[in-house]
Regions:
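Phosphopantetheine-dependent thiolation modules in NRPS/PKS and related acyl-activating systems
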Residues: 1-33, 37-42, 47-83
């Protein structure tokens, strides 16, 4: 999943640094992720993983790092399986 997230970051985040050079725990906002880019990334994640982000997860913490995004996506997928 992290590799997919990296590819989506490359396409949609417009970071001024190389996504490949970022650790999974690196702060994406410190690396240059804007609020606009985070929305574009969210839309790409929703399309790619066939999910919908609930309002409760639309916050900076959910998109802080590749690890955080992976946890957030996994929790949405897990919740969908339970429902």
């Amino acid at each position: 999943m992290n590799n997919t997230i990296r590819e989506l970051l490359k396409k949609h985040a417009g970071l001024p640094v190389s996504v490949d050079g970022l650790d999974d725990g690196a702060d994406l906002y410190a690396a240059g992720l804007s609020s606009f880019a985070s929305v574009q990334l969210m839309l790409a994640l929703e399309e790619n993983f066939d999910i919908e982000f609930p309002d409760s997860l639309l916050n900076r913490k959910s998109f802080q790092s590749i690890e955080a995004i992976a946890r957030t996506v996994a929790s949405i997928v897990d919740d969908r399986k339970v429902a």
